[in-house]
């Protein structure tokens, strides 16, 4: 009894096999190495119509090992849009770069070959990972996934403290009550705490209604309109 059934790239054109596997009602994963759009579409239709419990596709390059320039990972979001199923990567490349890029493009699962000892040889030894390498690979890919987050703007929790390091309008020399605010006595400097820098044209020509020391933040209560001294 297995939790899911994997159809390798070389079997994607065997529609009777796919239909039989799908009829077992288990989740299915189909690799798409070498396959045309029509061949992938036929495989998806066969799996769905035969009762696959759930279906995912894997973008795959069946070159052993796969060259980075031939992996065409931009196909991943295209496949998601075309067949409306989860898409991952069957990774036959060397190293973690392709898998990390795939995750950044929306891949939801990654298949990687494992060998207990690469020196033992075999047809997939060149791009297989040993156990300690697999652990590092998983950590690397998960770290990339964690950086994706969600679509949001504004300061994050850790950025809130950094807001204080923004610029604001401050006195850059002593200002006496009644002085006009000018570009010479007020400028945009760090830290925050004063009026926003984009208000500099608005405040220039206004009158200080109290004395300000060099470095003091400029706020609305410090100002009167021009002519009110």
Model-derived regions: residue spans:
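Catalytic cores and adjacent flexible loops of soluble metabolic enzymes
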Residues: 1-229
């Amino acid at each position: 009894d297995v939790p899911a059934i994997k159809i390798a790239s070389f079997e994607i054109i065997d529609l009777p096999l796919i239909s039989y596997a799908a009829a077992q009602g288990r989740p299915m994963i189909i690799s798409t190495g070498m396959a045309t759009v029509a061949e992938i579409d036929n495989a998806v239709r066969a799996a769905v119509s035969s009762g696959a419990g759930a279906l995912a596709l894997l973008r795959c390059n069946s070159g052993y090992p796969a060259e980075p320039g031939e992996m065409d990972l931009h196909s991943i979001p295209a496949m998601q849009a075309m067949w409306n199923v989860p898409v991952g990567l069957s990774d036959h490349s060397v190293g973690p770069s392709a898998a990390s890029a795939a995750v950044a493009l929306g891949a939801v699962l990654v298949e990687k070959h494992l060998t207990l000892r690469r020196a033992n040889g075999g047809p997939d030894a060149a791009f297989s990972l040993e156990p300690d390498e697999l652990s590092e690979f998983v950590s690397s890919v998960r770290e990339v996934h964690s950086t994706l987050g969600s679509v949001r703007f504004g300061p994050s929790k850790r950025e809130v403290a950094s807001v204080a390091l923004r610029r604001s309008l401050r006195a850059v020399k002593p200002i006496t009550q009644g002085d006009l605010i000018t570009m010479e006595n007020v400028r945009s400097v760090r830290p925050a705490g004063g009026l926003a820098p984009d208000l500099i044209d608005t405040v220039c020509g206004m009158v200080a209604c109290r004395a300000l020391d060099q470095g003091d933040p400029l706020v609305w209560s410090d100002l009167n309109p021009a002519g009110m001294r």
